[in-house]
Amino acid sequence: PFDHRSTFEKAGFEDISRVKQIIYEAFKKSLDTVENGAILIDEEYGDEILRDAKDKGYTTLLTTEKSGQEDFVFEYGDDFAVHIEKYNPDFAKVLIKVETEISDLTKTNLKKLNDYCHSTSLKLLIEIVSGGNLDLILKTISELQHAGIDPDVWKVEGMENEFAYEQIVQEAR
């Protein structure tokens, strides 16, 4: 629920951090144990939430991409590692939009993030947004793996049937 920076901004919310804090408070009340909860949020509007969630023992995922971009570019450019280390999340997360193929810029930045995560034992989650195009998801996973990009988690959109998920799992192995 927290990975929608541009949506909040376009909706004209004046105090996005406050809205996210309200959502976070409801999130905490809805869980019986911290082991069942994970927070995915950005640094800009979620600084206090990230710190509190980490202190309370929730799994934390920090967004790394600049919201609303066609290609994956780091929110904080070459200083991305400094911003990740500031929060010490369990996962670095990146969303990539794929309509036909992955741009060289996206691949280069994904490789940087992948190598950083592997060198620091930080887990990496890559979310592929393709409009639910199974063939494109499979092609993207294959292409990224051949480029040496190996996240801990591939996050994909909902698929039509179980067979589609089986194909994704097979490709990701």
Per-region residue spans from a language model:
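Alpha/beta catalytic barrel-like cores
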Residues: 1-101
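Generic structural signal for well-ordered alpha-helices
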Residues: 24-27, 47, 80-84, 110-114, ...
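A structural motif corresponding to the C-terminal end of an alpha-helix
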Residues: 26-37, 87-88, 117-122, 144-152
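Catalytic beta/alpha-barrel core
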Residues: 38-43, 90-106, 140-164
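Active-site-adjacent beta->alpha loops and helix N-cap segments on the catalytic face
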Residues: 45-51, 72-76, 98-118, 158-172
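Short beta-strand/loop segments at the ligand-binding rim of alpha/beta enzyme cores
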Residues: 57-60, 120-124, 171-173
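Core alpha/beta catalytic barrel or barrel-like domain that forms the active/cofactor pocket
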Residues: 63, 88-97, 125-131, 153-157, ...
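Conserved anion-binding
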Residues: 96-99, 106-149
